[in-house]
Amino acid sequence: MRPVRIIGAQGSHAGSINSTFHCTDVKVNGAWVRESEDDSGIILRYWDGHWRVQRRQDIEADPTMSMARLAAPDARPPLLLKKASEWQVYCHKDKTWIFKH
């Protein structure tokens, strides 16, 4: 699978999010997880039919709640993220979104 390039992210994590993600040997819901080549702490992860950019440390700390940004229904480069204020915390337990700025 080819690498995916993410562009257009803003905010404090933009430097690590705007990078190239390469495929790993990990699968989530039948889709490959992609890790950032610039920052191994950021991954592009498939969940509920969508790709999300997430911080690995958040997932490891609490798998039910993690920093997530809906990227696209299909990870075809380039993915364009919107402004940082649209980043959200998604709680998998009750399928709700909590907005964080």
PLM feature spans:
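Interface elements of modular peptide-recognition networks comprising either
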Residues: 1-101
